[in-house]
Amino acid sequence: MRLKKLPIRRKMPMELAYIEKLFREEVGLDIKEHKDKAEQISETVVEIYEELLRKGIENANYNGRDYVSYYDLPITEDLERYMNRFIQDRGEEVLKAFVDYLAKLEEELLKAEEALPPLDEELHQKKADILGGIMLMFASVAKQINGDRKLYAESIPVTREVLRTMI
């Protein structure tokens, strides 16, 4: 089964405060006063997750399975490092609101996944870690591209493309 586009809603209900606090305290990047940037960032995170899931579906089909395993997803070493960082920082106050947001996002993804092959339990359990890792990776790459504390709108598409090549 090859999907052109996963049926996941693009506009995520992420408040600017979640991303703003995460970016400022984790990598020192300021996105204050720009709600549209938060929406672009959350859309990018979901797009990257969709790409991973799409490739995971292809790998599961290639291996003759009718379910998708966590190990079917092409998790790179870089993404795994950011996932581990997210897991370690999950208890910190800066990430609590973001983890709560990820729980809401997971509900949205589960609704969309009804049209997909079933996902194994480990993949369900690691979904928030994957999304959080992608978000931290986005923040880190954006900081390197911008070079200072402010996130510029024109750097978001560049960051998106860099992430696509890294993952």
Curated annotation (Swiss-Prot):
Q: Could you state a single Gene Ontology molecular function term?
A: protein heterodimerization activity
User: Which family does the similarity line name?
Assistant: To A.aeolicus aq_328.
- Name of the protein this chain belongs to: Uncharacterized protein aq_616
User: What taxonomic ancestry is recorded?
Assistant: Bacteria, Pseudomonadati, Aquificota, Aquificia, Aquificales
Organism equals Aquifex aeolicus (strain VF5)
Q: Which domain of life is it from?
A: Bacteria
State the Pfam families in the record: DUF1931 (PF09123)
